[in-house]
Amino acid sequence: MANTIGKMFSVTSFGSSHGKAVGAVIDGCPANLELNTEDIQKELDKRKPGTSGVTTPRKEEDKVQILSGIFEGKTDGTPITGVVYNNNQHSKDYSMFKNTPRPSHGDYGWMSKYGNYDYNGGGRGSGRITIGHVIAGAIAKKLLKTKNIEIVSQVIQIGDIMAHSNDFDTVKENVEKNSVRCGDLEAAKAMEELILSKKQEGDSIGGIVETVAVGVPAGLGEPVFERLDGDLARILMNINAVKGVEIGFGFDVATSCASEINDEYYIEDNKIYTSTNSSGGIIGGISNGMPIISRIAVKPTPSISKCQKSVNLEKMEAEDITIQGRHDPCICPRATVVAQSSVAIVLADHMIRSGYIHPSNLEI
């Protein structure tokens, strides 16, 4: 089972939804980065459940404990271990799924591959595992901040409701003002109403999350394998419920002409820019200094209270199921910080690999 990602800045995720704890081990963060528990906790608070009507009612404090890697308020170059203990599991809600896979969940695949499958809360395949992503992402973002790189994520679409585009600073401010975490406050209200209506119906709804990174220098990534956009696509597709990834114009390039979307260069203050950013800040697998823009398509949470058809694998017969428990009517709001963290992990890794950040000591 693959649980580690990254080359120089690597992240190993551990734990399960209803196990004792979840978390991550981060290896390769250079020494002398100022870091404390609050830096990580404020990011975890953005993804923790039970914070609004558009998220799961499961109540978890999600308080992080740092077990290693920090000495006197700074990283010491050794692996950083962050752990969050689970406190509010309702495993009885899942006993009926021991032999009956839930539609559009990973249950059947896990059963087929591993045999011994922890079905409680989805086990290792639960969205709760992304706590590890956020712990690592908080550290990566703090590291990137030393090089003036900032990242913001927002929900830009829920169902057929789309947000209007705003500048980076406006989005950064507005996402903190609404439960949907959308940079367009008017659209956010409509999105919230749609999510709550689906919740009332016992259903769920999907959407799109956009992430923008500014301040990224030109030169990150490789031209063939380990392209920057390839690594971003890989980590973003590894987020639970993500079914599609776009960089820049994404699939819209299929209906465009080169004359419409080519990013033309110009010089300003002795620096190179492009007049447009159709490529989303990455051309030929390598960053070009423009904002890096990615989007993920997030499917509706498959755990819904409507009756669904499945099969009993022990009896080998059809079986109808109704999923009880505490589930998100839309995972997009909480997925924003996970997407942001994932992008930060990849950028931190490439910044070290490309020589922009010293691999062992920030003070060198």
Curated annotation (Swiss-Prot):
The keyword Hydrolase does not apply. Coiled coil: none annotated. Its cofactor is FMNH2. Disulfide bonds: none annotated. Keywords: Amino-acid biosynthesis, Aromatic amino acid biosynthesis, FAD, Flavoprotein, FMN, Lyase, NADP. Its EC number is 4.2.3.5. GO terms for biological process: amino acid biosynthetic process; aromatic amino acid family biosynthetic process; chorismate biosynthetic process. Gene3D superfamilies: Chorismate synthase AroC. Pathway: Metabolic intermediate biosynthesis; chorismate biosynthesis; chorismate from D-erythrose 4-phosphate and phosphoenolpyruvate: step 7/7. It catalyses: 5-O-(1-carboxyvinyl)-3-phosphoshikimate = chorismate + phosphate. NADP(+) binds at residue 47. FMN binds at residues 124-126, 240-241, 284, 299-303, 326. GO terms for cellular component: cytosol. CDD domains: Chorismate_synthase. This reaction introduces a second double bond into the aromatic ring system. This is Chorismate synthase. It comes from Methanobrevibacter smithii (strain ATCC 35061 / DSM 861 / OCM 144 / PS).
